[in-house]
């Protein structure tokens, strides 16, 4: 910026002070400081000249608004913001050369004419020569080319015009002058932007100017000392230098954010006001900036004017092309000062820096969770709303984020474009490859501040931290159960929906979880390399062998904190805990009965369908449950390996022994909440509870009669089948019920 003590600045300050003088009769409007172009004249401007016109015009408008001299938005401002051409149909006055308006934009200042009334204002340019500063005169007259203009310029190098009267078509410079408090910008508003009627000589001069106007390209004499870039005009150089100095003189009063350009401040302030003046005719969407509307409209038109010379890929925005080209060049101009990591895109660089600062400015109103990126917040909010906008055409599954949808789609295509150079393993996502490569290096850069545990992945650390905080922000809308991880909630929801999206391509078996499918697929491809030394049973995974060996060792490392009962497997403990919590998430659609395990629901459904898939090879009898078949088969072998220590009675199943031992101990652990009656077996409690609810879930397929207990249904079905399974060993008579056999046996002597 120039020193305010310079002759130029003194002149401009003098003009500024005239604003408050008593003799200033008319306020400055935007019409006083605008240059109009015809379509033909506009085409003569090169891109640099058009950019300069846009920048200066928008800047002038900003300053007029800031001091209260402009209220409504002129059409030319809207045109410039939207990126359209701001030429007029018929010019009211002739305009000089293309260089003419540029010089006037930067240098034009006029002497005050306070006695001219509004009626006397004219849209004509009157140039009367009066004495002023040498350099100012030279710059002003430089662009006016008409007959004899070069000679006149040479003659006036040492003599300055005494007075310059500037009309509504002349724009003053805003680069110099006193500081405007609202914008923090050096602003000068000339108070003498008035007009008067042209003289005949002036009219003749204007005609001569129009007839002899030819575009003259100005030499790029203003050079940047930092990078060597040259500009035709010093105002453009001043704006460019802000990229080196970091100067941001335009400050927002709402949030204190500063900008290097005034038009950027205007656009930013619309964030606070919510003003979106640029509306799309196709979909009605509003935008803060005109260029944003232009870019958006290409979505509807499909226009992609920016094409990559390397690969031919086209883009709707020039910035996207620039970013894309860095893929070919490998350029990464944005480097982090903290860790030295480089990025090809500024947005990625800004997001990365939040890792070091810990900044998470985007907060969810529902659960108060914060995020480093607005896109992450938007995707997260869909968890609460249930919105799933991305639908797979293959299987119909919907997703709330594009990245999740893309990853899912690779399941159908089998695409795994990211391959490890060490072991050749391929992945469908680049992030998975990056994580996998740490298994070769052993790198664990993420440490827990609570316990010091290290992790290879940041996501693993984030999940681990929830163990310390106990945070469970993801809640199921069906049953209210909460989870620490979004993925756990997604998997849990499949319990309610019965969804099994992961199907084995070999045998067609479907699974609710991808991990289960991966494990299952190993049964087709992998050998069972892990063999039990006790019984010789082989397993695909070492973890499965370790679990199996607990059968032989009797190890039960998982203990219930409620009752102290121990279990061999963690899954068994989880299922057991549901007894204490009363949780029964698996509900039958036929009768509404709920179960705490999915397998119990599957077995229960066979009551309604009548399915008995387990058949005895000895006698052909079929059973609903595999365990029932196993129990039945022991009647053929007479095997009863489980003996009671009290009475030496033997049983074919350990569960029967456990139930029998309660006769000796009197233990009745299953208590009814309604009447406090206790039972030694859970099945007895379940059947008893039906007496309170009146529920009769067991239905006869023959006569549709219902029963509260399964044993009653079994006994009833013998009426239809004629089955009499209880035979007397003495006389061979058979009975439908065991109680009837017991009564009959009393008739024989010695019983």
Swiss-Prot record:
Predominant expression in testis. There is a cross-link at residue 206 (Glycyl lysine isopeptide (Lys-Gly) (interchain with G-Cter in SUMO2)). A zinc finger (C2H2-type) spans 222-244, 250-272, 278-300, 306-328, 334-356, 362-384, 390-412, 418-440, 446-468, 474-496, 502-524, 530-552, 558-580, 586-608, 614-636, 642-664, 670-692, 698-720, 726-748. Residues 191-202 have a biased composition (Polar residues). InterPro entries: KRAB, KRAB_dom_sf, Zinc_finger, Znf_C2H2_sf, Znf_C2H2_type. GO terms for cellular component: nucleus. GO terms for molecular function: DNA-binding transcription factor activity, RNA polymerase II-specific; RNA polymerase II cis-regulatory region sequence-specific DNA binding; zinc ion binding. Belongs to the krueppel C2H2-type zinc-finger protein family. May be involved in transcriptional regulation. This is Zinc finger protein 184.
């Amino acid at each position: 910026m120039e020193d305010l003590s310079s002759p130029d600045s003194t002149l401009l300050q003098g003009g500024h002070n005239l604003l408050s003088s008593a003799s200033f009769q008319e306020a400055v409007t935007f019409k006083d400081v605008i240059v109009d172009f015809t379509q033909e004249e506009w085409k003569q401007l090169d891109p640099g000249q058009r950019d300069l016109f846009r920048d200066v015009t928008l800047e002038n408008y900003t300053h007029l608004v800031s001091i209260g001299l402009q209220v409504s938005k002129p059409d030319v401002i809207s045109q410039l913001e939207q990126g359209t051409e701001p030429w007029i149909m018929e010019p009211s006055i002739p305009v000089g050369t293309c260089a003419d308006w540029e010089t006037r934009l930067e240098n034009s200042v006029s002497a005050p004419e306070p006695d001219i009334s509004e009626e006397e204002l004219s849209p004509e340019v009157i140039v009367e020569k009066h004495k002023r500063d040498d350099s100012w005169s030279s710059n002003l007259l430089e662009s006016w080319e008409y007959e004899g203009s070069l000679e006149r310029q040479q003659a006036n190098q040492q003599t300055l015009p005494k007075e310059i009267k500037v009309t509504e078509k002349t724009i003053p410079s805003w680069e110099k002058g006193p500081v405007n408090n609202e914008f923090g910008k050096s602003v000068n508003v000339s108070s003498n932007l008035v007009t008067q009627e042209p003289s005949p000589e002036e009219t003749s001069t204007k005609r001569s100017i129009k007839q002899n106007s030819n575009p003259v390209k100005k030499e790029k004499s203003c050079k940047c000392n930092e990078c060597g870039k040259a500009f035709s005009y010093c105002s453009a150089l001043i704006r460019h230098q802000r990229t080196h100095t970091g100067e941001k003189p335009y400050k927002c009063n709402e949030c204190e954010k500063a900008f290097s350009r005034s038009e950027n401040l205007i656009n930013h302030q619309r964030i606070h006001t919510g003003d979106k003046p640029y509306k799309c005719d196709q979909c009605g969407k509003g935008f803060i900036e005109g260029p944003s509307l232009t870019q958006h409209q290409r979505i509807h038109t499909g226009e992609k004017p920016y094409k990559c010379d390397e690969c031919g890929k086209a883009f709707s925005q020039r910035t996207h092309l620039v970013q894309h080209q860095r893929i070919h060049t490998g350029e990464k101009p944005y480097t982090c000062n903290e860790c030295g990591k480089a990025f090809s895109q500024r947005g990625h660089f800004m997001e990365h820096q939040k890792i070091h600062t810990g900044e998470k400015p985007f907060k969810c109103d529902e659960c108060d969770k914060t995020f480093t990126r607005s896109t992450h917040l938007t995707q997260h909010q869909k968890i609460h709303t249930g919105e799933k906008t991305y639908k797979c055409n293959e299987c119909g599954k919907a997703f709330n984020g594009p990245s999740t949808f893309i990853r899912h789609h690779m399941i159908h295509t089998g695409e795994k474009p990211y391959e490890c150079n060490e072991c050749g393993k391929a992945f469908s996502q680049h992030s998975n490859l990056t994580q996998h490569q740490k298994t070769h290096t052993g790198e664990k850069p993420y440490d827990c501040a609570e316990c010091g545990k290290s992790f290879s992945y940041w996501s693993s650390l984030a999940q681990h931290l929830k163990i310390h905080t106990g945070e469970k922000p993801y809640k199921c809308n069906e049953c209210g159960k909460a989870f620490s991880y979004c993925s756990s909630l997604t998997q849990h929801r499949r319990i309610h929906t019965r969804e099994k999206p992961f199907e084995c391509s070999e045998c067609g078996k479907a699974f609710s979880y991808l991990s289960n499918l991966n494990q299952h697929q190993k049964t087709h491809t992998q050998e069972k390399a892990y063999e039990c030394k006790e019984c010789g049973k082989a397993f695909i995974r070492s973890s499965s062998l370790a679990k199996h060996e607990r059968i032989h060792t009797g190890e039960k490392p998982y203990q219930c904190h409620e009752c102290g009962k121990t279990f061999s497997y963690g899954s068994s403990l989880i299922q057991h805990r549901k007894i204490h919590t009363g949780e029964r998430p698996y509900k039958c659609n036929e009768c509404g009965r709920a179960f705490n395990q999915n397998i119990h629901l599957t077995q229960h459904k066979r009551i309604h369908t009548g399915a008995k898939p387990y058949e005895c090879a000895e006698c052909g009898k079929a059973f609903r449950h595999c365990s029932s078949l196993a129990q039945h088969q022991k009647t053929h072998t007479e095997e009863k390996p489980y003996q009671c220590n009290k009475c030496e009675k033997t049983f074919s199943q350990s569960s029967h022994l456990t139930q029998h031992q309660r006769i000796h101990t009197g233990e009745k652990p299953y208590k009814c909440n309604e009447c406090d009656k206790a039972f030694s077996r859970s099945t007895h409690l379940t059947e008893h509870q039906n007496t309170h609810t009146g529920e009769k879930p067991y239905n006869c397929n023959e006569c549709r009669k219902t029963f509260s207990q399964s044993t009653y249904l079994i006994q009833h079905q013998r009426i239809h089948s004629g089955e009499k399974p209880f035979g007397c060993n003495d006389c061979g008579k058979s009975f439908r019920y065991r109680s009837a056999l017991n009564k009959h046996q009393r008739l024989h002597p010695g019983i």
